[in-house]
Amino acid sequence: MKKVLLVNGPNLNRLGVREVNVYGKGTLATLEADMKQEAEAMGVELECFQSNHEGAIIDRIHEAEDIYEGIILNPGAFTHYSYAIRDAIASISIPVIEVHISNIHQRESFRHESVTAAVCAGQIVGFGFYGYKLALFALMEKLREA
């Protein structure tokens, strides 16, 4: 059974109460439960991790290479400025799919650039929670191609 790590970055623990007009009413717990169910149906073991701390996210990315076949990552606001997370992604050999609930290109101008996307296998934005499922499908396809 393939193993995948789902990493959610800062403030995503506030889903369901934070800017519901942008992120919707669904909670992180709901998202994680739905993703685990989807993964199980695909024969994939999914582990979920959320942190508001850059170093903790970097540590999980580093550790993932020896445990998982791939990562689905929503770096949150770190997307736009964390060269440290970018370098952590670049340092591992497993594919990473970047996902965002909202379309970062339709939001404030400071959100338009992703410093992490260039070292990811792909990026999915703007499809709400469904984007995470798309990321899982894309990651499984990427692994089949390898």
Swiss-Prot record:
GO terms for molecular function: 3-dehydroquinate dehydratase activity. The keyword Transit peptide does not apply. It catalyses: 3-dehydroquinate = 3-dehydroshikimate + H2O. Pathway: Metabolic intermediate biosynthesis; chorismate biosynthesis; chorismate from D-erythrose 4-phosphate and phosphoenolpyruvate: step 3/7. The record marks R18 as: Transition state stabilizer. Catalyzes a trans-dehydration via an enolate intermediate. Homododecamer. Belongs to the type-II 3-dehydroquinase family. This is 3-dehydroquinate dehydratase. It comes from Bacillus anthracis.
